[in-house]
């Protein structure tokens, strides 16, 4: 099985388990910069060199050896389930992707047909009822996660805990897990704990939000998208995320964590 979704600097200073929609573009660019003293020109997800990735066959052996011996600090970054799935909806369902097409070809037409969502027309720029469409998308996302129908869940809305757990189950151990909502604090702790060829000054690092501008702007406060049924669906899908990463399931308007992440608890519960 190995370590899918895992990136590592070429200097082997640090190992990162990617969780989609959790600042991964920015983190990837920081790792790249820490080795090379410059940013990757383009979306870091497209980088085929300069950063070890499990998806590159020539990287798998070095990542595997490092993780199995815990030679470098390993970390990941997590996000509030409410804002994460809302972001996935606007980016992946409503938005036009970097290649000028809809995400995953026939995915969006299928969700439009089967679940009656609207996405703002062919270019994603038209007006539509964002709240009603998002709530219908939630039903679709729940069906993919709970019943694996009409398709398997996509990595952008499958549970964060699922992404985090594969690293543990296959023999890795995290030294740090931090919240997207407290990004600078968490990323700084990682940087303080490692030695890199190039020093990173977080205050000068831009935010590489590669999904920004793909889809329509969110028009309402986060909590307006979640009625009682929506909150029930979100909890059904992301119960472990709320519990293990200490987010408030009862209040969609509070994106901040309400407790401290316990690494021993994470490894015990997600390593089963």
Each language-model region and where it sits:
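Membrane-interface amphipathic segments in extracytoplasmic regions
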Residues: 1-272
